Amino acid sequence: MAVERVSTGIPGMDEVLNGGIPERNAVLLTGGPGTGKTIFSQQFIWAGLEEGEPGVFVTLEEHPVQVRKNVEGFGWNFREYEEEGLLAVVDAFTGGIGRASEYEKYVVKDPTDASELIGVIRQAVNDVEAKRVAIDSVTPLYIDKPSVARRIMFRLKRMLAGLGCTSILVNQIAAHERGFGGPGVEHAVDGIIRLDLDEVEGRLWRSLIVWKMRGTAHSMRRHPFEITDEGIRVDPEKVFVKERGEVREVED
């Protein structure tokens, strides 16, 4: 039976994933600072909206007003889809302090309370009948209590998959950290995409690699990508060699 897939909406990324993300998968998008994790997650939501798939974007590390302003730089108008009832932005950043309590429909008062967060996300998903969810990021949920990281990720995955959503869960790691952030989180998700920003001989290179993706074959190579005025663009026909700072054609 053919695997039902969800397009990432990121040029070149679906080719890396052999056609897209398997439906209902929870994907950990991990990487260091400045690697493009937030843009990737927002582009995933935007692509769905453009294809008629409602979505939910959860922000834990940036004011929702700033989120809307930032995406406009790529030509993505979140406000329009919010007004149409196709997009919900969940504010898990302000804690309802200030004017956010007046203007934001979905507010998490205590972002460190996983149960409250899950409850608000569930409500938002049901209200807009979301097919896609992006959480930026899950790191604050367990940064002070790493022992519960895996359990929290399981709860999020179970809830989102149960509601029929395909999700991107942004996760932070240190610039040169080899792990995925939080003990055991890699076992609690269906897929892992790692973004990297490496300095080689005085130049910064962006690249990504799919560490795992349940339900589908995928490229096992590290591919270069760039951030343009229209978002992220991946080159599935090229492979990046970190040690040498070289980009080569993919060989069969």
From Swiss-Prot:
Gene Ontology MF term list: ATP binding
UniProt: ATP binding residues: 31-38
UniProt signal peptide: none
Domain of life: Archaea
Domain KaiC: 4-248
Coiled coil: none
PROSITE patterns xrefs: KAIC (PS51146)
Keywords assigned: ATP-binding, Nucleotide-binding
InterPro entries membership: KaiC-like_dom, KaiC_dom, P-loop_NTPase, UPF0273_KaiC-like
NCBIfam families from the UniProt entry: thermo_KaiC_1
Family: Belongs to the UPF0273 family.
PANTHER family the UniProt entry points to: UPF0273 PROTEIN TM_0370
Name used for this protein in its record: UPF0273 protein MK0039
